[in-house]
Amino acid sequence: MVRPLRNVILWSFCIVGGLSAQDPRTIIEKTVNHDRRNYRDLQSWTYKVSDRIEKSDSSGRTKAIETTLDEVLYLGGKPYIHPLRKNGKPLPAKDTAKEQAKLDKATAEASRLSEDERRKREQQTEKQREKDREMLQYLPDAYNFTLLGEEIINSRAAWRIGVEPAPHYNGKYGFLLKNLEGTLWIDKDENQFVKGDIHAIKGFSIGLFLASIAEGSRLYFENVRLSDGLWVSHRAGFEGSARVLIRHIRQNEELQFSEFRKFQTDSRIVPAEP
């Protein structure tokens, strides 16, 4: 019995030693940089986004469920979004034809762009993309990180990292980041965000105080790796309460991303199967 017990103890020390040798802040810094490259590379792909919103009353009972299905394309370096379904049903034939005409027009306009015009649009898209992801670059300074262990997710090893606000952080987005904590999972081999589960530890306001998020609200996301190595969103959501102006909203919303493929200039809207 002594040798097996000793082996277990030695194995435990090896695991702890392996974890302590990893700096979670460094892991996060690398992951943020990789995420920026992923987001940039996504512009050569088209994919579908389903949006499900479940609205509840003050007692938590469901009042209404709304769903949409859209396709996202990049035309001439600029994102283009058009609808496919609403509330589980294909668009009426008239609306489908209208959306196809709009897509054909946008595709034709993109094909006539000069190199300078295309480059300018790409630069504008890149500027907006950097703005959308800007907050991520402040994560290493805004939080204290704890390496909690490893997990296997989708047959790949991932670090599990606890995230807590750094008490003395007063930098950009501090008004938001100081009110969120949770757990991040990072792919070990490629330093990519695999998933996140974040909670509001305090209520906070956003958008010049025009909107606020209630304490206890939850934000989550999951990413997946495509066969060519690109990491993309799989699903993301919000659960909780918010206030917009004087209106209180209680809802769960989830976005699901699917059917990633290289964009073809002859893309046409194909009615989704009922």
Question: Which stretches of residues belong to each language-model region?
Answer:
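Bacterial N-terminal signal peptides that target proteins for export
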Residues: M1-W11
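Hydrophobic h-region of N-terminal signal peptides that target proteins for export
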Residues: S12-A21
